[in-house]
UniProtKB/Swiss-Prot annotation:
It holds the Pfam family Ppx-GppA. Belongs to the GppA/Ppx family. It comes from the Bacteria. This is Uncharacterized protein SCO0757. The lineage of its organism: Bacteria, Bacillati, Actinomycetota, Actinomycetes, Kitasatosporales. InterPro entries: ATPase_NBD, GppA/Ppx_hydrolase, Ppx_GppA_N. It comes from Streptomyces coelicolor (strain ATCC BAA-471 / A3(2) / M145).
Length: 336
C-alpha cells in the first residue's frame, strides 16, 4: 500500500510518500514548499488571504505530486499556526474546496501522542520508559510513556518561531542579554509542571525530534544528514548550553553560516536552542537521542495500525472543534 502525508507546519509544507509494506512506512519520495506562515501570522491573528492563497497552491502541488507517485489521497494536517488562527475553519474549508484535500488541524496533545508513537517505533521497546521533546514553530510538545502511546503529554506555546516573534524581534540583531533572559524565564515558567513530571518518572531513554533539534544537534557535533538516518546521533545538555551562548552572540546572517543552521531557520535558532536547553535542564536530561521519525511517521503508523476509520475520526473532530487553548498537562488516552 502506498500512501502520503502532507504536513502544514509553521515554516514549510512537507509531503512524504511512503510504502507501508510490513507495517513500516518506507519513504519513496519527499518534497517541500516553503511558506513561512509563522512570519505572516502573529499568535492569535487570522491567516491573511495572501497566505491562504499560497497554502492552497502548496497543498494542490503536494496532492498532484502524491498522485504522480501512485499514492492514495494525502492525509493532510496543519499544526500550531493554522490551529490557533481565529479563521481556522475558513482556511480549512477553502483548502478543501479548491484542492479536494480535506486538510485538518491536530490538537497539540495529539501531535505529541503521534510523535511519541513514531519515536517509540524507531527506538524500539528496549528503550524502556521514554521521554520525548519536540520543538515546532508554534509549540513545544513533551510526552512520557512506557508503552505504545504516552501516559501523559504536554503541549505548550513555546515554539521557536512564536518565541522569536515575542522576545527576539525588537530590531536588535544579535539579541540583547535582557531579551534572552526574558525568553528563558518564560520557558521555565510554562514548562515547570511538565518538567517535574518527567523528573519524577525517571525515563530510561530521552529522545528529541523536529528540524529544530536536528539542526541544533548538528551544531553540537552530531554527524551530518548525509550519513543517513541509521547513524546514531546524540546531543548533550552541556553542549547545547554552549551553543546558546554561541548563537546569542551572532546575528541571524552569521548563524546561517554555522554547521547545521539553515538560512530560513537562522533567525529562530536562538529561541529553539533556549527552549531545548531549558527543557533538558528542567527535566534533568543530560543527553537526548536525535530521532529522525516524528509526526509524519506517527500519522502513517496510526493509519497503518488502526485503519482509515481512525483518520476519518480525526478529520471529523477537527471540523467540529473550536481552536484549543494551550494545554499545560494532560493525561493521554491510549484509545485516541
Amino acid at each position: 500500500m502506498r500512501t502520503s502525508v502532507v504536513d502544514v507546519g509553521s515554516n514549510t509544507v512537507r509531503l512524504m510518500v511512503a510504502d507501508a509494506e510490513g507495517g513500516v512506512p518506507l519513504p519513496v519520495h519527499t518534497a517541500k514548499w516553503r511558506l513561512r506562515l509563522s512570519e505572516q501570522v502573529r499568535p492569535g491573528d487570522p491567516v491573511p488571504e495572501e497566505a491562504v492563497e499560497r497554502l492552497v497552491g502548496a497543498v494542490a502541488d503536494a496532492s498532484r505530486t502524491a498522485d504522480r507517485w501512485g499514492a492514495s489521497g494525502p492525509l493532510a494536517f496543519a499544526t500550531a499556526v493554522v490551529r490557533a488562527a481565529p479563521n481556522r475553519r475558513e482556511v480549512l474549508r477553502t483548502v478543501q474546496a479548491r484542492t479536494g484535500v480535506p486538510l485538518c488541524t491536530l490538537p497539540g496533545e495529539v501531535e505529541a501522542e503521534l510523535t511519541f508513537l513514531a519515536a517509540r517505533r524507531w527506538m524500539g521497546w528496549r528503550s524502556g520508559p521514554l521521554a520525548l521533546l519536540d520543538i515546532g514553530g508554534g509549540s513545544l510538545e513533551v510526552a512520557f510513556g512506557r508503552g505504545r502511546l504516552p501516559g501523559f503529554v504536554a503541549s505548550l506555546p513555546l515554539g521557536a518561531a512564536r518565541l522569536t516573534h515575542e522576545f527576539l524581534a525588537g530590531g536588535r540583531d544579535p539579541a540583547s542579554p535582557e531579551q534572552v533572559k526574558a525568553l528563558r524565564r518564560r520557558v521555565r515558567h510554562q514548562l515547570r509542571d511538565a518538567a517535574a513530571r518527567i523528573r519524577w518518572e525517571g525515563p530510561r531513554t530521552a529522545v528529541a525530534t523536529s528540524r529544530t533539534f536536528q539542526q541544533l544537534g548538528r551544531l553540537c557535533g552530531a554527524p551530518p544528514g548525509r550519513y543517513g538516518p541509521f547513524t546514531e546521533r546524540r546531543m548533550r545538555c552541556s553542549d547545547l548550553g554552549d551553543a546558546v551562548g554561541r548563537l546569542a552572540a551572532l546575528s541571524a546572517a552569521e548563524r546561517a553560516r554555522l554547521p547545521g543552521i539553515s538560512a530560513p531557520r537562522a533567525a529562530q535558532s536562538l529561541a529553539g536552542a533556549v527552549v531545548g536547553h531549558t527543557a533538558m535542564k528542567l527535566t534533568g536530561l543530560e543527553a537526548v537521542a536525535l530521532c529522525p521519525w516524528a509526526i509524519r511517521e506517527g500519522v502513517l503508523l496510526r493509519h497503518i495500525e488502526d485503519g482509515p476509520a481512525w483518520w476519518a475520526e480525526v478529520v471529523r473532530r477537527s471540523d467540529e472543534a473550536a481552536p484549543p487553548a494551550p494545554v499545560p498537562l494532560r493525561l493521554a488516552s491510549a484509545s485516541n
